[in-house]
Every structure is written in structure tokens, then in C-alpha cells.
Regions:
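SAM-dependent transferase fold signal centered on methyltransferase-like domains
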Residues: 1-159
Length: 159
């Protein structure tokens, strides 16, 4: 995952698009390696493209602009469910939300898209980096690398 957040990797990931079969994987690996891209970069791009393809079931078209880990995708709240949670918080008058153990930021995306101020907290730095990428379009969302049990919640309306 070290090279995934580079401009080159993100460009290649967009070029690769969806991967639907093992034949696609082989074809894309061959093409990228012939173009001179390092094996590690190609592996990370292929892995991410496959995760994006699988993520469409949870995130619809949003998956094509997100980054995932295997565990993060498996544990992420489905977009429709996160949207219901976010709507309930908004209707309840809550404005400042702490999303503890945010993972890749699925719930935080829903909160932020409704205009709620979100601080997403994730202990794992690599997962937090992906959450930051996924939340980048929202100026009302931030990600902090921290232990959720130690995080100060005094300034938040809801957790």
C-alpha cells in the first residue's frame, strides 16, 4: 500500500478501471509491466482495482473514486445503511460527529455528505490514510490517527 497514494498509482488505477475476470488481471499486468511500471506498483493497482469492483455492491458508483483495504471493505457499512444513520443524526440536531474506529470512512462519508462536521478517528495509519483519501472531497471532514479509547470527545454532539 506504500505506493498506492502516489499520483502515478492513482492515474493507473483510473486507467485500469473495473476488473471482472482473471483474464483481465493477466492482461492488465502484462500491459503495465511492458510499459515499465514496477511490479509492486502494478500489484497494488491491480489489488485496488479488484477491491473497487467488489465494492460496487456496497458503495455503487462511489466505489470507483474510493480506496479500500480487504478488511476495510468487508467491515464497511453499506452506503444505504450509513445514509440512514447520518439522516437520523441530522434530524436529531447533531452537528459535530466523532466516528471512532472509522476504518475506510464509510459512515463518515455519509455524515459529511449531509453537511455534518465529522472527525474520523482511526488507529491504523495506513487505514487512516485511505479514509483521508475517501473523505478528501469534504471540507467538513477530517481524519485523525488516534486510539479511540484515548480520544477526547468533549467537543462532539454524537459518537
Amino acid at each position: 500500500m506504500n505506493q498506492l497514494l502516489t499520483a502515478e498509482a492513482l492515474r493507473l488505477l483510473d486507467e485500469v478501471g473495473e476488473i471482472d475476470s482473471k483474464a483481465d488481471v493477466l492482461s492488465i499486468i502484462t500491459k503495465l509491466r511492458k510499459a515499465g511500471h514496477p511490479a509492486l506498483l502494478v500489484t497494488e493497482v491491480i489489488t485496488q482495482a479488484r477491491l473497487r469492483t467488489r465494492a460496487k455492491a456496497k458503495f455503487g458508483d462511489f466505489a470507483s473514486s474510493m480506496l479500500f483495504t480487504e478488511a476495510g471493505l468487508e467491515q464497511a457499512t453499506r452506503l444505504q445503511v450509513a445514509a440512514v444513520h447520518a439522516e437520523r443524526l441530522k434530524l436529531g440536531g447533531y452537528k459535530k460527529i466523532a466516528d471512532l474506529g472509522c476504518g475506510i470512512g464509510a459512515d463518515s462519508l455519509a455524515f459529511a455528505s449531509l453537511g455534518l462536521e465529522v472527525t474520523a478517528v482511526e488507529q491504523d495509519p495506513q487505514t487512516a490514510a485511505l479514509a483521508s483519501f475517501n473523505l478528501a472531497p469534504f471540507p467538513n471532514a477530517e481524519v485523525q490517527v488516534s486510539d479511540a479509547e484515548q480520544f477526547d470527545l468533549t467537543s462532539f454532539d454524537a459518537v
